């Protein structure tokens, strides 16, 4: 934060290991705290290129701009499979289209190349 340079997060993570839950949850708390402290001070930009689930899903919600890859990107706190009747063929609540059009958590959806290009333009 001292230099005022933007923070850019490129996310693709299958989640945390239960064996490391306490340490991982503490790390999430530290990340969230630093994001909140940086809010309004420096730009925060997130690109989701694969799975972004569980506690990691809070990270893009705290950033200023969120980009998501349109075919492989998935964003969820609880697995979409945990919702009764949520079949991908009916409605994939973790998809880029859903997160952008219905949830409002994603600002830009596109291919990996498009997203990286738009992130460069934004910076």
What are these regions (language model features)?
Residues 3-4, 41:
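Glycine-centered short loops/turns at secondary-structure junctions
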């Amino acid at each position: 934060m001292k230099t005022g340079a933007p923070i850019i997060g490129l996310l693709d993570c299958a989640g945390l290991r239960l064996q490391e839950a306490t340490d991982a949850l503490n790390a999430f708390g530290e990340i969230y705290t630093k994001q909140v402290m940086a809010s309004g001070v420096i730009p925060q930009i997130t690109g989701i290129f694969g799975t972004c689930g569980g506690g990691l899903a809070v990270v893009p919600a705290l950033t200023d701009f969120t980009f998501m890859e349109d075919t492989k990107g998935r964003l969820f706190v609880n697995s979409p499979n945990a919702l009764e009747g949520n079949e991908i063929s009916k409605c994939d609540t973790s998809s880029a289209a859903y997160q952008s059009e219905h949830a409002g958590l994603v600002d830009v959806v596109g291919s990996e190349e498009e997203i990286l290009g738009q992130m460069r333009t934004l910076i």
